[in-house]
């Protein structure tokens, strides 16, 4: 089922008697053609408890650079694998993903568990720009707020100065974090947005 798909390894973190250890939870494959998508869905993975996990949590907890950024800037919570990959490529190692645009109680409990090991000042919800992402961001914010998390939702309509130009809205062609260039993401970080 993963043949000819772009594969992401999903890892978790578990405690053993000697500290935190990474654990491979599954492999998820993204369809690369419409035929694949129609046959087996856009994403296919071996069974795992997705509702209990946060993608890229292992880096947040075990990688010193990611840990430092998480302590300083907080968590950037996105929808998916490609969003995390683009943010990390741009140097934002404090990115994680819900693997969707909603959050389960199990994922909230996972964030509580992460917060007990890594202090972070806030969570920035950087979900997709589409209606599902915007609605999801508001619902996720509400649920996280009720669990004591300081949460900010990324404002897709904000004015930003890219390349020293006059501030203007983020182009409509950018629909999610993965659509941004490395330079655009780095500009947002320099402006203190995340």
Write out the residue ranges for each language-model feature.
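Phosphate-handling DNA/RNA-contact segment within nucleic-acid enzymes
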Residues: 1-119, 137
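TOPRIM fold recognition
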Residues: 35-37, 72-73, 81-194
